[in-house]
Amino acid sequence: MEAGPHPRPGHCCKPGGRLDMNHGFVHHIRRNQIARDDYDKKVKQAAKEKVRRRHTPAPTRPRKPDLQVYLPRHRDVSAHPRNPDYEESGESSSSGGSELEPSGHQLFCLEYEADSGEVTSVIVYQGDDPGKVSEKVSAHTPLDPPMREALKLRIQEEIAKRQSQH
């Protein structure tokens, strides 16, 4: 019983049953393994960079719109006729001087964030009219009438809530 012709050395299989590393298929496998390892290293490195970036300092503007911020008023009103809370005072100064000198104490700081990401801050005092406050916000950030009315109602609720606390 003869198994057949014995393979010649270097032709089909080498003695010992090892793979022929010169074969083209093995080169493709090794190239794919190396590419996979390189890609895996890049992904792990990017994940490490992302974790490092999370520990950066917080942004300068507050993320919560109801965050109360204390801004002391100037004692000498004649030296500072404008309230620094109302930026771009061209719109607010033309509507009257009583808005610049609030009659009551500070209730809360209203911060409205527009769709563009711009934040408008207005301090609401005890005697303020919700309609005028919503007009101040819409002077900085254009609002359509239904949004302005909704903002007015929300300001009214917040004023009532804070006045009941004091």
From Swiss-Prot:
Residues 91-104 have a biased composition (Low complexity). It comes from the Eukaryota. InterPro entries: UPF0561. Residues 34-49, 73-85 have a biased composition (Basic and acidic residues). Residues 32-107 are annotated as: Disordered. Belongs to the UPF0561 family. This is UPF0561 protein C2orf68. It comes from Homo sapiens (Human).
